[in-house]
């Protein structure tokens, strides 16, 4: 038992009492108290009581306001079929005997059931039985039109937008930011999901209460951790994942295998937490692989599936009588679910499959209905004609479903009435601020990532500076400058490839958070760009300072500043391009392969290896799409734009030809002969090639260096927009 001390705004104790586990929801506390201080007198996780500001408990005349609002979730005849590719055989090669190359596979076949608030419904079965598919169907994560059947809450069909607000879905994998502490992780979830109108102190209060409810107080200040950083345990990670999705105290909670990969003790602790959440007034529906005896004692309803069919549906207590009636009684002192799953696997491997068990379950369900005609209906409420809209509103008034907000709302017609459903808890700029702060905090605790990238850029710049040290104004110097610029500009893009795994690592976090409107996709895209940009500035300055003066580039201070700008623009467009690809490709290795290949094509068509005028017409479009082309042409113009600078004088005319091996005297005589032949006096000091001539020879004549800079920056914005469209169209998080 724990003792909760409730205080007023002046921190003066005004009421103190011991709290029992049957008290009301945590959400109620947010509206009615200012602070909560826990004094441990045991190891039981505290549950909070509901108090008025004057310190008295709300009872008596107001008791009907606090009476639990009943919810019953029912699903009937859920059927889900998918088309799968069929293996080709010899007959498919014969035109007149060719059949369809796909066949229909049934993942769910007329699945029905129901559960209510305060209960845990567990879906069991072997791998491939349809557990996760059923959870996805109930959570509206299957595309509309693909799923047949109905899902209702209190007898009324659930609209997609309504379900988003009143429910939460916990994925099987614990995808969390590794360098955030448990407390920070839950606090960011509170900032995303709880309304802006709720003071930050109340949000902190909600987080602290949730930490106690999840039983992770000792790990509150510990980072989540990953392979390279020691953090919390697997069971604690799972409870944090659950906490993120129940921060707003949802009415319905879906979980996909919450005990997967955990030892028996950790699994029991997780389900024990779920039981507390259910007792606070939530409906818990989860899939589970093979629960232990202790876990089974916490479950209220079970559904066993076998290849999409229901083979058992009922309470755990009815398992022995069910299998005894089927002719396979469960031995004493044996785990009932293990016995049931072993029997189902054995039947699946037999000739008749589980058809007999499916039919027996149907008869057994009919016998139950005949012996007990009372269906699962809500108990009497203050208003027996309470609609779903009114029930949800009443639940919100009790403190359940702490969400809503200032970010705009949509009105849903439901059951003859309307209910304002908030689209987002926060306005656009608050989302950007919070997302940016979270990313910076997570990245700041991993300085080695920026350090390694900065070291790579500096080392690359140092190698280039020493290889192309102090280039002179000669024909060879011109060719070496061209090689330096081509390699340097392509390096800007290749070093951006490390941005690829960033979003791929965050993909499922992003999908989980946006699935329930934690924030807008546009907010994420802008925040991602804001967090990325400062590091690009450091990288640009590091490379520019390392190479500009060492290589001996022209232009002075203004030339250096433009050199910095075009490098920054190259980093920006390269980072945006790789970020866009990260929203398209599903795997890191595939992404790296695509990035390397496309950047190689960009370099090929940049104009360094082959001039624009010599590129075949059917490939010229790739030249204009090349990201390397524009920064390459910009630095060429920055270097060769001075009309007084000469790069080929007199006898240097022969340097890039076999005649370059001749002695200086022979070159002078040859130059004199050339002068007489063309009728023009050419001395050893005559300028034959200026910077403008070099640009013309390279085909750099269409755009100014500032236009090239703007186009490079524009490419960066274009790929950010394309990244947003990928997130908008490709992250619906639904099966088809």
UniProtKB/Swiss-Prot annotation:
The chain crosses the membrane at residues 410-430, 449-469, 484-504, 525-545, 569-589, 590-610, 709-729. The keyword Transport applies. Pfam families: ABC2_membrane (PF01061), ABC_tran (PF00005). It is a multi-pass membrane protein. ATP binds at residues 125-132. One of its GO terms (biological process) is pollen wall assembly. Coiled coil: none annotated. It comes from Arabidopsis thaliana. Belongs to the ABC transporter superfamily. ABCG family. Eye pigment precursor importer (TC 3.A.1.204) subfamily. SUPFAM superfamilies: P-loop containing nucleoside triphosphate hydrolases. This is ABC transporter G family member 16. The keyword Repeat does not apply. Residues 88-332 form the ABC transporter domain. The gene is ABCG16. PROSITE patterns: ABC_TRANSPORTER_1, ABC_TRANSPORTER_2. SMART domains: AAA. GO terms for cellular component: membrane. It is found in: Membrane.
């Amino acid at each position: 038992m724990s003792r909760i001390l409730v205080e007023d705004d002046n921190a003066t104790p005004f009421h103190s009492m011991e709290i029992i586990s049957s008290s009301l929801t945590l959400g109620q506390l947010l509206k009615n108290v200012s602070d909560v201080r826990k004094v441990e007198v045991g190891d039981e996780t505290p549950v909070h009581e509901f108090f008025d500001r004057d310190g008295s408990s709300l009872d008596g005349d107001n008791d009907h306001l606090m009476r639990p609002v009943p919810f019953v979730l029912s699903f009937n005849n859920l059927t889900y079929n998918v088309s799968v590719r069929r293996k080709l055989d010899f007959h498919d090669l014969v035109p007149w005997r060719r059949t369809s190359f796909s066949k229909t596979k049934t993942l769910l076949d007329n699945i029905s059931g129901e559960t209510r608030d305060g209960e845990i419904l567990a879906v069991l079965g072997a791998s491939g039985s349809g557990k996760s598919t059923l959870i996805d169907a109930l959570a509206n994560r299957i595309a509309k039109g693909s799923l047949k059947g109905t899902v209702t809450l209190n007898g009324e069909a659930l609209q997609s937008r309504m379900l988003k607000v009143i429910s939460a879905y916990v994925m099987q994998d614990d995808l969390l930011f590794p360098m955030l502490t448990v407390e920070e992780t839950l606090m960011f979830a509170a900032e995303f999901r709880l309304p802006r109108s709720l003071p930050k102190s109340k949000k902190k209060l909600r987080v602290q209460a949730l930490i106690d409810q999840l039983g992770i107080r000792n790990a509150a200040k510990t980072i989540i951790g990953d392979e390279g950083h020691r953090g919390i345990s697997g069971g604690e990670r799972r409870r944090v994942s659950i906490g993120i999705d129940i921060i707003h105290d949802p009415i319905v909670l879906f979980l996909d295998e919450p005990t997967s990969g955990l030892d028996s003790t950790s699994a029991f602790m997780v389900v024990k937490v779920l039981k507390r959440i259910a007792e606070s007034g939530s409906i818990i529906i989860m899939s589970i692989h093979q629960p232990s005896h202790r876990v089974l004692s916490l479950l209220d309803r079970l559904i066993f599936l076998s290849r999409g069919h229901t083979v058992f549906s009922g309470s755990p207590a009815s398992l022995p009588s069910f299998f005894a009636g089927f002719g396979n009684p469960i031995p004493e002192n044996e785990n009932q679910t293990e016995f049931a799953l072993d029997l189902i696997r054995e039947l699946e491997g037999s000739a008749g499959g589980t058809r007999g068990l499916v039919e027996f379950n149907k008869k057994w369900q009919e016998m139950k209905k005949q012996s007990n005609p009372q269906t699962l209906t809500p108990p009497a409420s203050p208003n027996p004609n309470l609609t779903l809209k009114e029930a949800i509103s009443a639940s919100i008034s009790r403190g359940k479903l702490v969400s809503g907000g200032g970010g705009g709302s949509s009105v849903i017609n439901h059951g003859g009435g309307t209910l304002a459903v908030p689209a987002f808890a926060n306005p656009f700029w608050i989302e950007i601020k919070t997302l940016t702060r979270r990313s910076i905090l997570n990245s700041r605790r991993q300085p080695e990532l920026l350090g390694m990238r900065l070291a790579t850029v500096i080392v690359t710049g140092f190698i280039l500076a020493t290889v192309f040290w102090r280039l002179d104004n000669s024909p060879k110097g011109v060719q070496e400058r061209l090689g330096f610029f081509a390699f340097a500009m392509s390096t800007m893009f290749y070093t951006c490839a490390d941005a690829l795994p960033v979003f791929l690592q965050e993909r499922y976090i992003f999908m989980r958070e946006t699935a329930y409107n934690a924030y807008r996709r546009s907010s994420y895209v802008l925040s991602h760009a804001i967090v990325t940009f400062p590091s690009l500035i450091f990288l640009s300055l590091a490379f520019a300072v390392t190479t500009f003066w060492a290589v001996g580039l022209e232009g002075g201070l203004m030339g250096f500043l433009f050199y910095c700008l075009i490098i920054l623009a190259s980093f920006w467009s390269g980072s945006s391009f790789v970020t866009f690809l990260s929203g398209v490709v599903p795997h890191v290795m595939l992404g790296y392969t695509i990035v390397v290949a496309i950047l190689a094509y960009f370099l090929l068509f940049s104009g360094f290896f082959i001039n624009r005028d010599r590129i075949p017409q059917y490939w010229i479009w790739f030249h204009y799409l090349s990201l390397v082309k524009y920064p390459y042409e910009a630095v060429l113009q920055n270097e060769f734009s001075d009309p007084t600078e000469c790069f080929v004088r007199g006898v240097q005319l022969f340097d890039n030809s076999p005649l370059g091996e001749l002695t200086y005297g022979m070159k002078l005589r040859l130059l004199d002969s050339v002068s007489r032949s063309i009728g023009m006096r050419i001395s050893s000091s005559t300028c034959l090639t200026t910077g403008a001539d070099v640009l013309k020879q390279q085909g750099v004549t269409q755009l100014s260096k500032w236009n090239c800079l703007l186009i490079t920056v524009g490419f960066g914005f274009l790929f950010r927009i394309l990244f947003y469209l990928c997130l908008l169209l490709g992250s619906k998080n639904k099966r088809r």
